[in-house]
């Protein structure tokens, strides 16, 4: 599309993309592999090679060196905020070289020395760029000092200038003043080059939102990726767009600018829900039971996102029973005989749930929701990235056995039988 519009492109094909995307772009099944991602481990690199066998051949014909519009290729993504294994970066580069990449490479990291040292390949003459959203003078000066340390007189570029920010559940929508943003962008372009992140807001469709790591609590991000960008989620110009346009006109009056295209959007009204059905009523039409002695995680059952229902039967040993879900993630709803008894979230999971036992044999259902895997930082390989129940469920002091497990990715509603009971 960019080529058709006469635009050049900078492509960032790393298997890790961050981008507030589920698991930073990695497939969930990698969590079953026992490998250390973003390292030089053979198992991981073999998977990257398989991925590049498909992806890179789609990129090669579009390189500038082949008459296309791709100017540069990124090696990894903010690797200096994760590791410092130079052999890994070289391996990623070599995998792309072996498959026909001929345009220049670059790296992008935070603009301070620690991340630049850890994540760059400056001694191999691979362009170093920085990611930031303000204080261009300070950040470019830091990058210049790093360049000088290595004897480089290189151009300065902010590869990700954060003109807005992503949003998380339970938090206020992040706002940024349009005029302040325009002045911050001016500070960048007077010293170097800029790539706005994001220029056009978007959507993390379905269950593909990412999650932020904060200590023992993870903070799921919302589905919208509007980001407060100059073009909003619908593709229409915002106040930021016009503020940037005005700044460019005042700073670079010779640059020709055109009025942006706009499109009509739908007025949001109440949308009535026509169909409804109980999950328990339609369970057998949307999923097949996987029988196991103990609960398995979502990943071990071959599922990546959505929900998973664990079902078993328990005997009445007392008028009230103490139940506990051991090592579950992210949100757990416990039902006894299809009646909700408790909802627990993240660190609450594992606390005692005292339930009345009305009959000799009781049906126990535990519905677990994957609310998004961490996409950035130190918890990419944490146990909490594995969703569902990791250890088991206890009644009194013993683990309950003999479970039916129902995978509920809910990627389609075609098999939902809405004629059944609500």
Ranges and model annotations:
Residues 276-311, 407-422:
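Edge strands and adjacent loops of beta-rich recognition modules
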Residues 80-101, 107-147, 170-173, 202-210:
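Substrate-binding cleft/loops of secretory-pathway carbohydrate-active enzymes
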Residues 221-281:
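Aromatic- and carboxylate-lined catalytic core of secreted/periplasmic carbohydrate-active enzymes
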Residues 7, 98-99, 135-232, 236, ...:
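Catalytic-core region of carbohydrate-active enzymes that cleave or remodel glycosidic bonds
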Residues 15-17, 28-33, 55-56, 232, ...:
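An acidic-aromatic loop/edge-strand motif
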Residues 1, 30-50, 74-85, 127-136, ...:
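The substrate-binding groove and active-site-proximal loops of carbohydrate-active enzymes
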Residues 320-336, 364:
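Aromatic-lined ligand-binding clefts that engage carbohydrates, nucleic acids, or primary amines
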Residues 1-103:
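Active-site mouth of glycoside hydrolases
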